[in-house]
Amino acid sequence: GTGLVGSEMCIRDRNRPDWCLSRQRAWGIPIPVFVNKKTGEPLRDKIVIDRIVSSFKKGGSDAWFEIPASNYLEPEYDANDFEQIQDIADVWFDSGSTHAFVLEDRDDLKSPANLYLEGSDQHRGWFHSSLLESVGSRGVAPFEGILTHGFVLDDKGRKMSKSLGNTVNPQDILRDYGADILRLWVAGSDYYEDLRIGPEIIKHHTDHYRRLRNTLRYLLGSLNGFQENEKIDYSDMPQLEKWLLHRVNEVNNSVREKIEGYNFHSIYTEIHNFCTIELSSFYFEIRKDLLYCGEPNSLERRGCRTALDILFNHLTAWLAPILCFTAEEAWQCYINDKENSIHLKTIPISVNNWNDEALNIKWKRIRFIRSLVLAEIEEARNNNLIKSSLQAKVEIKLSKEDKDLFENLIAADIFITSEVSFSIEKLETPKIKIDNADGNKCSRCWKILPEVKPEGLCNRCEDVVKIYCS
């Protein structure tokens, strides 16, 4: 991580042995030095050095071996008085000087670099040599930060080798699963440690990818035909949508912060959990009835679709650096404009007006009560009392404080049941009873309500059908 620049690397450099720069090899970058045979001192003369530089510019570094020493030394010196060094520089000296001939010589790059990125073995290699050379010649580090990662191992934590037969060819993953699955594995791996890869690990990430893709599919389906004039102001939105935008803000702030810290593994985990736990298993489930069966131009439905539009714009921006092809595919399905790529957008700026921690705390408690209700519904289903949650009537005994949470909310929609009744008792944890709902099943929304005639519609669905038929 970047913290090593100020701590561990300083300790290592302080305790390091002297660095011998010369190597006796047949090929490499020469050390262009002449040594006085009598005194053993290297020649320091700007005229000679300028000749060497000019020669290298014309013929490359091989000119040191190809051009006679007299061409560099005379007439100021007698070439017979000097030994021409034939050693080459340590290869780490070559790579360590990239800050000078890569960053400083190009107008489209800046020096020092924002980040140096390499494996953990480079603390004694490239990072080390770059730091020494830049500090020694420029007085500053060549980078603002460094990021190191572990090595790729097989799924059992072993180094890959042909003899073990445990190598993984990225091309095979690209062929069988696609590039986004491989990118998801990279983003989902904690690079502070060694990274493991194998068939089961790729399958695990494929399952996660499918959940993320299904989230995008739900959003695209729910936003079909959405127009700009359908949007409503935040102040007019239902309470649940205001909670959703609060959470979008929280995740957005977290994603931006983690990007700055190169904490991609945590970004992936947070987005995945948000999509599966808070969206797919909670918000999407609750709003299916409103989206599928609600009055098309109602304020509640418009508020829901406005929030989903905001969510889609944020989610595709979050996913674009990781699932670049999937994010672009979803984006084009929504806007249908080849000139307007998701990769031309940036992570949105958070909207302070959406922050509402009190509302978030309230909905955390509602979600807890909902989890208790769903557990009882599941038990009733296992006992063959009901077949689906819409067949259920829920009776809840709870404290007045908990009951007040549901004021101005349709509790049956939150629990995805047909009927809910509350009774107040002094309880820390609500008590829940499940029974069969009274009435007949609406053939459109499938809720069981007393008002429904056999094979008929509930009052809400009758009104909506009239709107569509008018």
Language model features with spans:
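Positively charged, low-complexity/disordered segments
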Residues: 2-6
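A broadly conserved sequence feature marking short terminus-proximal activation segments
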Residues: 39-52, 381-383, 391-440
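Flanking scaffold residues of small Cys/His-coordinated metal-binding clusters
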Residues: 31, 437-440, 452-453
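Short Cys/His-rich "knuckle" micro-motifs
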Residues: 84-87, 452-457, 468-470
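Cys/His-rich metal-chelating microdomains
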Residues: 448-451, 461-464
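Acidic, turn-prone loop/beta-hairpin segments
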Residues: 35, 82, 226-253, 284-376, ...
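Structured, non-catalytic alpha/beta "coupling" segments that mediate domain-domain communication
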Residues: 202-228, 321-333, 393-427
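Structured secondary-structure scaffolds
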Residues: 7-8, 12-225, 244-287, 291, ...
